[in-house]
Amino acid sequence: MKTMIAWLVLLTFAAALCFADEGLKQEHMNERKKSRFREDIPDEISEDLLLQEMEAMEAELLEKEMRMEENRNSREKRCLGEDISCGEKPGDLVRMPCCAKYECKETAGYWWYQKRFCVKKKSG
């Protein structure tokens, strides 16, 4: 019975401490809010500052969006990938270029196929 009472006292103490800690956290948050939005600055000035910050953020986002759109429009439209005949001989009908990371070369099977193929550029 004595141990049950001791455990109940300990549980009550822990619960009270927890609620007291939550109250301190709430007070701390209120103090931070007050310090962040000082009352000595008039409302009009704080609204103007907020408006300027939002306009700057909007301009930055619009600039990023324009750059993304330029990148989308400037990408390669049609090109040939790896191991596709690129046909750079004058008599060939297919004249599409290889993609940027490939080059048109005579591969090991050139003697048989008589065609060039797009292969990866060597990075060395």
From Swiss-Prot:
What family, per the record?
Answer: Belongs to the neurotoxin 14 (magi-1) family. 04 (ICK-6) subfamily.
In Swiss-Prot or TrEMBL terms, this protein is called U12-barytoxin-Tl1a
Q: Give compartment(s).
A: Secreted
Residues that make up the propeptide are 21-78
Q: Does the keyword Secreted apply?
A: yes
Q: Name one GO molecular function term.
A: toxin activity
Print the keywords alphabetically.
Answer: Cleavage on pair of basic residues, Disulfide bond, Ion channel impairing toxin, Knottin, Secreted, Signal, Toxin
What does the function comment of this entry state?
A: Ion channel inhibitor.
Major subcellular location class = secreted
User: In what tissue types does this protein appear?
Assistant: Expressed by the venom gland.
Give the disulfide map. Answer: C79-C99, C86-C104, C98-C118
Its UniProt domain note says: The presence of a 'disulfide through disulfide knot' structurally defines this protein as a knottin.
Q: Name one GO cellular component term.
A: extracellular region
Q: Which InterPro entries match?
A: Toxin_22
Q: Where is the signal peptide?
A: 1-20
